[in-house]
């Protein structure tokens, strides 16, 4: 198994699909990486030489992925909460942020129903 950005990339999968195992790299970015490194999208990871894998590592390192990206996202949410803006308040209360209705629905975000005490 090749190791890129601290993640074991599956050997049996095509390069584009295997790169999506890294948090922060989707199909579009994986295709862009393959195009910029001149590695075939349909080539399997086990078929790549060590030099090609090193080129992939260097290309992936240009992007914010895995731990750095997770940290950046959590810091952005924390910043919104510290500002006290509407989105920050909605994050703090674990409610939907983007105008969805909450009288009904929103159960995933709000969690299981709490019984009314008498």
Curated annotation (Swiss-Prot):
GO terms for molecular function: rRNA binding; structural constituent of ribosome; tRNA binding. It holds the Pfam family Ribosomal_S13. GO terms for biological process: translation. InterPro entries: Rbsml_uS13_C, Ribosomal_uS13, Ribosomal_uS13-like_H2TH, Ribosomal_uS13_bac-type, Ribosomal_uS13_CS. Residues 94-118 are annotated as: Disordered. Keywords: Ribonucleoprotein, Ribosomal protein, RNA-binding, rRNA-binding, tRNA-binding. Part of the 30S ribosomal subunit. Forms a loose heterodimer with protein S19. Forms two bridges to the 50S subunit in the 70S ribosome. Belongs to the universal ribosomal protein uS13 family. Located at the top of the head of the 30S subunit, it contacts several helices of the 16S rRNA. In the 70S ribosome it contacts the 23S rRNA (bridge B1a) and protein L5 of the 50S subunit (bridge B1b), connecting the 2 subunits; these bridges are implicated in subunit movement. Contacts the tRNAs in the A and P-sites. This is Small ribosomal subunit protein uS13.
């Amino acid at each position: 198994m090749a190791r890129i950005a601290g993640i074991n990339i599956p050997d049996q999968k095509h390069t584009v699909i295997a790169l999506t195992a890294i948090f922060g790299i989707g199909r579009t970015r994986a295709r862009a990486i393959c195009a910029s490194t001149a590695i075939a999208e349909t080539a399997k990871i086990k078929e790549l030489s060590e030099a090609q894998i090193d080129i992939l590592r260097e290309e992936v390192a240009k992007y914010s992925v895995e731990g750095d990206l997770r940290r950046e996202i959590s810091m952005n949410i924390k910043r919104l909460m510290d500002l006290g803006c509407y989105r920050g308040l909605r994050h703090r209360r674990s409610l939907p942020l983007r105008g969805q209705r909450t009288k009904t629905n929103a159960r995933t975000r709000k969690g299981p129903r709490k019984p009314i005490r008498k």
